[in-house]
Amino acid sequence: MVVTGFKAFDSKTNNRYGMHFEEKKVYSVDGNIKFGTCGNGYHMCTNLEDTLRYVDNYDNIVIGEVIGFGDIDQYDDEYNGYYDMYAVRKLYIRRFISREEMIKMML
């Protein structure tokens, strides 16, 4: 299975745990893949606006277009209206999008 979508980063393209990401690279994680705060895997969303749910007050948010593959765990939060969120074993950072592109995609 392959999933395309988005992932949020801080202004230095680090995730909330301090791991740095770069364009055109593949990242992989070991262990069982499970979505959630106690889970394991790289989190991503198919809807760009859903990535903002996971941002911790970054001054300058960077959004990456990503491809997730390998083992994948899908999660839908029907109570809060968030759908198609994933934890993936392997994550490819296709590119980082500009703030202008991000706004256009969300309108």
Residue spans of the language-model regions?
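Short, glycine-biased loop/turn motifs at secondary-structure junctions and
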Residues: 1-107
